[in-house]
C-alpha cells in the first residue's frame, strides 16, 4: 500500500515501513519497479515512513527512482509531513528524522488534502564558490545533500542533458543534484532541477 503525493510537481510514493510485504529485502529493486513511469506506478522517489522517537514525529528513508539512496528531499519531506499530520502523528509543528538530520516543519495552511508547510532545511554550506564543471562556472553547495548550481541567461539549451552529465561527473563521487538558475530581478529567480537519481523532476520555481 502507498500514498502518492507531490511537492511542486516533484512526486513521491509514500509507504509505512510496517506495511511492507514480508520478505521484501531488495528495496533498491522495489524502488526501481514501483517508480517506473511505464511499468510501475511512477514517481521521482519512494519514501519509507516510520513512527518517530524522541523529538521526531516520524522518520523517513528516501529511495530514488533509479534505486539509489538519498539523504533528503525538501519536497519529499514536506509530503511526509502531510502524511504524518493526516495520520494524527503531528499537528502544526512537525519534526522528521531524515538522512540529513532532524528537520522542523510548520503547517501554514490546509485545505482538504492540500497542505502548505514552512520548512527549515538549515544553512547551505558553500563548498566551492567558483568551480568549473563541463566548461561552465558553477557553485558547489551542500544543503543536506550535494548540489551543483549553474547560473544561466536562458533555458533554451539541453539543460537536462547537461544535468545528466554533471550528476555523474568525477568531481562528485556520490553524484550530485544539479540546479540551473536564471536571475529575473533582485527578488526573483527561475530554477530548473535535475535531481540525483531521478533526473528532470518537473519542478519549476
List each language-model region with its residue ranges.
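A glycine-rich beta-to-alpha transition motif near the start of alpha/beta enzyme domains, typified by
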Residues: 1-113, 149-205
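Alpha-helix C-terminal capping segments
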Residues: 49, 130-133
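Short, solvent-exposed secondary-structure boundary/capping segments
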Residues: 113-121
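Short, charged/polar, Gly/Pro-enriched secondary-structure boundary elements
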Residues: 125-129
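Internal active-site segments that recognize and position negatively charged phosphoryl groups
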Residues: 132-159
Amino acid at each position: 500500500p502507498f500514498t502518492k503525493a507531490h511537492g511542486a510537481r516533484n512526486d513521491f510514493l509514500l509507504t509505512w515501513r510496517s506495511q511492507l510485504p514480508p520478505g521484501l529485502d531488495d528495496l533498491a529493486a522495489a524502488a526501481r519497479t514501483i517508480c517506473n513511469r511505464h511499468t510501475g506506478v511512477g514517481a521521482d522517489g519512494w519514501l519509507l515512513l516510520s513512527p518517530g522517537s524522541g523529538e521526531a514525529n516520524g522518520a523517513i528513508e528516501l529511495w530514488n527512482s533509479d534505486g539509489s539512496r538519498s539523504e533528503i528531499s525538501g519536497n519529499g519531506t514536506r509530503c511526509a509531513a502531510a502524511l504524518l499530520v493526516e495520520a494524527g502523528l503531528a499537528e502544526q509543528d512537525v519534526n522528521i528524522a531524515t538522512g540529513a538530520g532532524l528537520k522542523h516543519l510548520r503547517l501554514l495552511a490546509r485545505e482538504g488534502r492540500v497542505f502548505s508547510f514552512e520548512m527549515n532545511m538549515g544553512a547551505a554550506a558553500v563548498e566551492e564558490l567558483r568551480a568549473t564543471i563541463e566548461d561552465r562556472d558553477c557553485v558547489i553547495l551542500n544543503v543536506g545533500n550535494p548540489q551543483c548550481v549553474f547560473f544561466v541567461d536562458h533555458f533554451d539549451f539541453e539543460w537536462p542533458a547537461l544535468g545528466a552529465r554533471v550528476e555523474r561527473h568525477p568531481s562528485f563521487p556520490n553524484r550530485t543534484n544539479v540546479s540551473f538558475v536564471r536571475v529575473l530581478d533582485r527578488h526573483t529567480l527561475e530554477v530548473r532541477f535535475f535531481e540525483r537519481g531521478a533526473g528532470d523532476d518537473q519542478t519549476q520555481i
